[in-house]
Design a protein with these regions (language model features):
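N-terminal "arm"/small-domain region of PLP-dependent enzymes with the aminotransferase-like
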Residues: 1-50
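PLP-dependent aminotransferase class I/II
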Residues: 32-34, 55, 203-287
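Short loop-beta-helix segment that forms the pyridoxal 5′-phosphate
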Residues: 52, 64-86
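PLP-dependent aminotransferase-like
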Residues: 89-147
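Active-site pre-lysine segment of PLP-dependent enzymes
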Residues: 111, 129-141, 153-177, 181-213
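Short beta-strands and strand-loop turn motifs
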Residues: 119-121, 144-151, 177-181, 288-289
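PLP-dependent enzyme catalytic core of the Aspartate aminotransferase-like
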Residues: 161, 309-310, 319-350
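Conserved PLP-binding catalytic core of the aspartate aminotransferase-like
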Residues: 269-270, 280-311
């Protein structure tokens, strides 16, 4: 059985080596699942004999004031990836535009729906930043445009004025702009960076997830925001009716109360990202100045395997269009974990 290569394949590592690794390949909160969320999941177990609410009514009602968006403009799914595939199957775009490098599931979902995928290649000379040059790639033949904010794996943020120019270009060409903000909430200034103020346009859909910020990748819970309720209804109908389990819904409801936890995660990332960046550069590695809870850096192509044999796992970016085997993505984790990564890197590079 084959599938797209992603980070966080702890099961594959354990099967190969017989033990767990220090995993920097998955971009989830280094603080783990909040205790309040774990308690909510446990409390929901006695009701697991019931079907979950297919419309996630309670969760959407609580998300509405949290996001400042009407509940009818919110759709929940089995992680953001589920919603990406539902969107492709519901909208059935003929041609779509993605940046390169970026998250692989955009193209995978689009191609599964028979869509032709065009790539706007970002340039290493400007640290793979999205610039105004993307506007000329949005033509009347393009039905959908994906923009990851901050981009995965580069960690680069597209300035909000440029996001708005991209949206206006999409509107002029009849395309839907999909802005993936799944990692944006790791930033303390996320409220000033989100595209939510542009949601009066029915040509904008924003993707969000509980997975990363709340350390609940195994629970699978994401949602999207869009003023085009007809599109959301089509997405709801494009997959199975009970995509979000009752345990995941309980987890989401509890997670929205974890304000102290979120503040702690944001403070940790803000402290550790520049520290890890400096440590990597001190080893002679090229590191991009990203804003996310992960970093993209360049090193020897043998680096990933050498670390893996020592029990440390990075995300090789060799399968990202626009990158090669010399690029790696590392999560920003706790101070002791980051120190262990730097120590092991120093041994390998010596």
């Amino acid at each position: 059985m084959t599938q797209l290569t992603h980070g966080g394949d702890w099961a594959g590592y354990r099967a190969q080596y017989g033990h767990d690794a220090l995993d920097f390949s998955a971009n989830v909160s280094p603080l783990g699942l909040p205790q309040g969320v774990a308690n909510a999941i446990a409390a929901a177990l006695p009701h697991a004999d019931r079907y979950p609410d297919p419309l996630c009514r309670a969760l959407r009602a609580k998300l509405a004031p949290h996001e400042g968006i009407p509940a009818e403009s919110i759709l929940c799914g089995n992680g953001a990836a589920d919603l990406i595939f539902r969107l492709a199957w519901a909208a059935k775009p003929r041609t779509a535009l993605v940046t390169a490098p970026t998250f692989a599931e955009y193209a995978a979902a689009l191609e599964s729906a028979g869509c032709a995928v065009r790539r706007h290649f970002l340039q290493a000379e400007v640290d793979f930043a999205v610039t105004d040059s993307i506007l000329s790639s949005i033509t009347p033949e393009v039905d959908m445009v994906f923009l990851c904010q901050p981009n995965n794996p580069t960690g680069q943020l597209t300035p909000l004025p440029l996001v708005e120019r991209i949206l206006r270009r999409c509107e002029a060409c009849g395309a839907l702009l999909v802005v993936d903000e799944c990692f944006l909430d790791f930033l303390p200034d996320c409220d000033a960076l989100t595209a939510k103020a542009l949601l009066d346009s029915k040509d904008l859909l924003i993707l969000k997830a509980f997975t990363k910020l709340y350390g609940m990748a195994g629970v699978r819970l994401g949602y999207c925001l869009c003023a085009n309720t007809a599109l959301l209804e089509a997405m709801q109908a494009a997959g199975q009716p009970w995509a979000v389990s009752s345990l995941a819904q309980a987890a989401g409801l509890a997670a929205l109360d974890e304000t102290a936890y979120v503040a702690q995660v944001r403070a940790l990332i803000a402290q550790q990202r520049p520290r890890l960046t400096a440590g990597l550069r001190a080893l002679g590695l090229r590191v991009l100045d990203g804003r996310a809870n992960y970093l993209l850096f360049q090193g020897p192509e043998t680096l990933g395997d050498a670390l893996r044999q020592r029990g440390v796992v990075l995300r090789s970016c060799s399968n990202y269009p626009g990158l090669d085997g010399s690029w790696y993505r590392t999560a920003v984790r706790t101070g002791p974990e980051n120190d262990e990564l730097l120590k092991t890197l120093a041994e390998v590079l010596a």
